[in-house]
A protein has these predicted regions:
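Short active-site neighborhood of thiol/selenol oxidoreductases, capturing the structured segment around
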Residues: 14-26
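Structural micro-motif
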Residues: 60, 66-75
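Hydrophobic beta-strand anchors of alpha/beta hydrolase catalytic cores
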Residues: 20-21, 51, 74
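Hydrophobic/aromatic anchor residues within beta-strands of the central parallel beta-sheet
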Residues: 5, 49-51
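N-terminal leader/targeting and pre-domain segments
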Residues: 1-17, 101-108
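Typically the conserved alpha-helix immediately C-terminal to a functionally engaged Cys/Sec
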Residues: 30-45
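Non-catalytic, surface beta->alpha helical segment in thiol-disulfide oxidoreductase systems
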Residues: 75-108
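Structural microenvironment flanking redox-active thiols in thiol-disulfide oxidoreductases
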Residues: 54-62
Length: 108
């Protein structure tokens, strides 16, 4: 189940393991359209990948710190380090490949 992050919880939620960070906004149609896919992929990953959701309207400091300027933005992280970043309208295939990268344990 995706976890909603706040400025207080973001570092802890992303510090260990493979994490798919979803920066989204309530008025971002591409963000909303991709949410069911991301939820399904997390379920398929069986705990190998955690999804952390960041509502950009409520967490501007986190967005600023990570230089997230457009939505949607997806950041692939492992043990607190950024591996890769996808921004703008990305395809379902790109998101599936991101999950495969995180599940496989290899570099992006």
């Amino acid at each position: 189940m995706p976890v909603d992050a706040t400025p207080e919880t973001f570092k802890k939620l992303t510090s260990e393991g493979s994490v798919f960070v979803d920066f989204w906004g309530p008025r971002c149609q591409p963000c909303l359209a991709m949410m069911p896919t991301i939820k399904d992929l997390e379920k398929e990953a069986g705990g190998a990948v955690r999804v952390v959701k960041v509502d950009s309207t409520q967490n501007r400091d986190v967005c600023r710190e990570l230089r997230v300027f457009g939505l949607p933005t997806y950041i692939l992280m492992r043990d607190g380090e950024e591996l890769e970043r996808l921004s703008g309208e990305v395809s379902k295939q790109q998101v599936e490949e991101a999950f495969a990268t995180l599940k496989g344990g290899g570099a992006a």
